[in-house]
Curated annotation (Swiss-Prot):
InterPro entries: DNA_methylase_N6_adenine_CS (IPR002052), METTL16/RlmF (IPR010286), rRNA_lsu_MeTfrase_F (IPR016909), SAM-dependent_MTases_sf (IPR029063). This is Ribosomal RNA large subunit methyltransferase F. It comes from Psychrobacter cryohalolentis (strain ATCC BAA-1226 / DSM 17306 / VKM B-2378 / K5). Belongs to the methyltransferase superfamily. METTL16/RlmF family. Residues 1-35, 225-261 are annotated as: Disordered. Its EC number is 2.1.1.181. Its main location: cytoplasm. Residues 1-14, 246-261 have a biased composition (Polar residues). One of its GO terms (biological process) is rRNA base methylation.
Length: 345
């Protein structure tokens, strides 16, 4: 049974009557995404009273937080997860990625549309719900955000994998501590980092969809340069839409000597060759698991990587490929989806 968001604040526009296409044109979140407009701090503070310690008033007299304060952003995430997804315990180690929940939720809702339009078509065009839908999250991190959003929004089952033992242990603890997640999410350690699907997808496994938010930097230096730009943009956009702000700043600082102002371990933020190398490996390996997955999908943060990946997928003989654009304020990104079989259509 689908878990419904709790205490969602009404917005001025009837976002549930918008189409996803309209939302993208307007730079807005997916119509089913509950994180529309400004955060309702009164509601969120009721869900997590600790948030009151971090709430401030902006020059317009509106409640907000200091989005440059990693502790405040972390508590805001805890409040969002408690209020909208019923997650009572959520915490991550120092130095690990604290993700922007509104943007992460958008990915899941667009994937639900993809399934509704292709492999799980309902007469009323509603997204498929329930534990018969099994999703695989590649690189779940310590936060397990995609399994949380997907299981609590649509009732799906998730297998979540990562190459980092601390991430796996933390994500598993989050899921085991929350009754709503315990039976819905299984966390697995990838013991051979050179592989993405091998060791994770078993011979008897079938996943309706794979989701992935890949490392997007090729080196620590590139990650640091991106962080510098992000901090500049955070200052420049101060006072604008809060969902956009959290997408720029909602990460926890690490312990590295470089003193990066965002969270994320090496494995979360950068890998040799960057995003294109990781996704090239993912695409090639997906061919070996074509019979085990309905749709392979991934975020592609760099637009210049889309065409090379499309060309590669054509060479690999995929049966169908889609680019799903997402827009959140001034930030645009996209989902690349492909599959090798279309027998279910």
């Amino acid at each position: 049974m689908t878990s419904k968001p709790m205490n969602r604040r009404p917005t001025a526009n009837n976002h549930r009557n918008r189409s996803p296409e309209t939302a993208k044109k307007l730079g807005q979140l997916h119509p089913r995404n509950p994180h529309q407009g400004r955060y309702d701090f009164e509601v969120l503070t009721r869900a997590l009273p600790e948030l009151a310690k971090h709430t401030i008033t902006n020059p317009k007299g509106e409640s907000t937080i200091n989005f440059s304060d990693s502790a405040a952003v972390r508590v805001l995430n805890q409040a969002l997860l408690a209020n909208y997804y019923g997650v009572k315990f959520w915490d991550i180690p120092e130095g690990y990625l604290c993700p922007p929940i509104p943007g992460r939720a958008d990915y899941i809702h667009y994937i639900a549309d993809l399934l509704a339009q292709t492999t799980h078509v309902n007469k009323d065009n509603t997204p498929p719900t329930g534990k018969e839908i099994h999703a695989l999250d590649i690189g779940t991190g310590a936060s397990a955000i995609y399994p949380i959003v997907g299981s609590q929004s649509y009732g799906w089952r998730f297998t979540a994998s990562d190459i980092d033992p601390i991430s796996v242990n933390t994500a598993a603890l989050i899921c085991e501590t929350n009754p709503k997640l315990k039976s819905a999410v299984k966390v697995k350690l990838q013991t051979e980092p050179k592989f993405i699907f091998k060791n994770i997808i078993g011979r008897q496994d079938y996943f309706d969809v794979v989701v992935c938010n890949p490392p997007f930097h090729a080196s620590l230096e590139e990650a640091m340069e991106a962080n510098s730009r992000k901090q500049h943009n955070l200052q420049r956009h101060r006072g604008k839409n809060e969902n956009e702000q959290i997408s720029r700043s909602s990460t926890k600082p690490g312990n590295a000597a470089q003193n990066l102002n965002f969270g994320g371990q090496h494995k979360e933020l950068w890998s040799e060759g960057g995003e294109i190398a990781f996704l090239t490996k993912m695409a090639k390996e997906s061919q070996d698991f074509a019979e085990h997955v309905g749709w392979f999908t991934t975020l592609v943060s760099k637009s210049e990587n889309v065409k090379p990946l499309q060309l590669l997928l054509k060479q690999l003989g995929v049966a169908q490929m889609r680019i799903i654009e997402m827009s959140q304020g001034q930030k645009s990104t996209r989902i690349l989806a492909w599959r090798f079989n279309t027998d279910e259509e």
